[in-house]
Amino acid sequence: MDRGRCANMLKSLQRTLAKCQKSPSTKHWQCFKRNFTSIRATKYPGRSNSTFHYWPWFAASTLLATSLYYRDRPVQNDDKTDAFPSHTESIQVDSSVSDFPLTITALNFPVSTTFKLLGYGQRHVTFLRFKVYALGLYLAENDENLVSDTLNETYLHKYFLDVDDSKTPKENLARLLKRDDSKSVMMIDDLLDSGMRMLAKITPVRNTDFKHLKEGLVKTISKHPDVANNKDTLAKGLSELNDAFSRKGSVRKNDDLIIELLANGALQFSYHDSKNNEFEVMGVVNNQLVGKFLFSQYLCGEKSPSPQAKKTAIDKLITLL
């Protein structure tokens, strides 16, 4: 076989491998194996007529080794968000932005404590179905015990009548968190009232501006089911949010908005310019309803801005019960 045909076969193999890396379906891997078997059997005369050089076999072997590396690599794609790789330091939330760290500390972000990733997903604009930002929800490492301290057997029997006695308290609590929107709101709100510290990392997947980010936060907060009972207090809180979020201008794709829920219920906003790796603390909202309603919406209810992030976060919370 001549060099040109061998080169074309290798290019075909590379294209198939690229598809495998992007979408590791059974069909793509079967195609890769067929191409690999074909090219492995190929040989052609090298520069010396006295011997044969099996360079296609070696090249294909190299590609195969590379493919196995990527196939086994714990990279998370946009549609599979049900696992937290234990042996990596970050996870892919959306392929168009940088991976999200599994741990956020004061060494790399302007935060008050160490946070561990709780859940993650994307925010879509409903009527157009395009992605707006990647979202990571984090729980303070030292506050993990508050989950089981708050949502325990005593809590279950005190506030809920529809307890299935054939199931364990943990199974009953998990069922309420996952399947009953109204009760999950109550449970999450009680968790937040316990002083549980959280953090949200918002990373735009397209260029935007601070105005749009602020408007998105206000809309999310305003969808909490208890807004009607707290109009006056919340109005003051949203005024604080407007002052804390006074920065204007553009926010580039892959920059970060960091929202930290402090132990006293206040919210601290920080901005990360990823291109220059610069941080700015934008402001603080002391009104406790703003932070409570925002993170409650992230974690529960019918109108969460990212159902994907809500699901992964609730699944992780259940493991802490």
UniProtKB/Swiss-Prot annotation:
Entry protein name: Altered inheritance of mitochondria protein 18, mitochondrial
S-S bonds: none
One Gene Ontology MF term: intramolecular lyase activity
Keyword check for Mitochondrion: yes
Location of the protein in the cell: Mitochondrion
UniProt superkingdom: Eukaryota
InterPro entries according to UniProt: Chalcone_isomerase, Chalcone_isomerase_3-sand, Chalcone_isomerase_sf
Entry keywords, A to Z: Mitochondrion, Transit peptide
Family under the similarity heading: Belongs to the AIM18/AIM46 family.
Record has Mitochondrion as a keyword: yes
PANTHER family associated with the record: FATTY-ACID-BINDING PROTEIN 2
Transit peptide: 1-72
SUPFAM superfamilies registered for this protein in UniProt: Chalcone isomerase (SSF54626)
One GO cellular component term: mitochondrion
